[in-house]
UniProtKB/Swiss-Prot annotation:
It is found in: Cell inner membrane. GO terms for cellular component: peptidoglycan-based cell wall; plasma membrane. NCBIfam families: mono_pep_trsgly. It is an enzyme of class 2 (transferase). The gene is mtgA. It is a single-pass membrane protein. GO terms for molecular function: pentosyltransferase activity; peptidoglycan glycosyltransferase activity. GO terms for biological process: cell wall organization; peptidoglycan biosynthetic process; regulation of cell shape. The lineage of its organism: Bacteria, Pseudomonadati, Pseudomonadota, Betaproteobacteria, Rhodocyclales. It comes from the Bacteria. This is Biosynthetic peptidoglycan transglycosylase. The chain crosses the membrane at residues 10-30.
Length: 231
């Protein structure tokens, strides 16, 4: 029994050690990407692998642009649509999380997540789309790293450049060119609001650009944009 207990203790210490090494590895990338633009996120790599199963030579559409070359309308639209308290919270919108939990409980299934921009970025940079308790814990840890080591402006800049906006389309510049044949800097208010409305389900809206639901979301986002605070 003592031998078994000793082995269990060693196993536990080993798992803790691996967990800490993993966190240090993540921390290293977070520190680097605070100054260097990410080339490819974990989520982008997953989507590219999926595309290449059907088309081996497939490539993602993505072009990095500095924060200053992204339309203020798109910045306001994303804040209005995804995270109205972004500039004020420290990574987590507890009120939004509570509302999402109540909505899920009422529906009896998962229909809302309540994730902030920082949480969404943490998932996109490092994690897989699979849902698990470990993944939620990891997401929270990475979110805290981002919030404490990056400025809000840097978080938002990276987010706008790496989020999915269609089938193989990532980032504001690629989205602007894919849908409107213009640059991210030249997006108007309605174009920006429509792009922001696509964020929760971009591949669906890429296929169904005239969806009625998207039109309603666009109108709501447009109405909220003047009150949106951007970093």
């Amino acid at each position: 029994m003592k031998i078994l207990g000793r082995w269990l203790k060693l196993l536990l210490l080993g798992l803790i050690g691996l967990f800490l090494v993993w966190q240090l590895w993540l921390l290293g990338w977070v520190l680097l990407w605070g100054w260097v633009n990410p080339g490819e996120t974990r989520f982008m790599a997953i989507r590219l692998a999926e595309l290449r199963q059907k088309v081996p030579e497939a490539q993602l559409k993505q072009q990095w642009v500095p924060y200053e070359r992204i339309s203020i309308h798109l910045k306001r639209a994303i804040i209005a649509a995804e995270d109205a308290k972004f500039v004020d919270h420290e990574g987590f919108d507890w009120e939004g999380i509570q509302k999402a939990m109540e909505k899920n409980q009422k529906k009896g299934r998962f229909v809302a997540g309540g994730s902030t921009i920082s949480q969404q970025l943490a998932k996109n940079l490092f994690l897989t789309p699979t849902k698990s308790y470990f993944r939620k814990v990891e997401e929270a840890i990475i979110t805290l790293m981002l919030e404490n080591l990056w400025s809000k402006k840097r978080i938002f800049e990276v987010y706008l450049n790496v989020i999915e906006w269609g089938n193989g389309v990532f980032g504001a510049e690629a989205a602007a060119r894919h849908y409107y044949n213009t640059s991210a800097a030249q997006l108007g208010p309605e174009q920006a609001a429509r792009l922001a409305g696509m964020v929760p389900n971009p591949r669906y809206y890429d296929r169904n650009r005239s969806a009625q639901g998207l039109g309603r979301k666009t109108a709501i986002i447009l109405a909220r944009m003047p009150a949106a605070d951007v970093p």
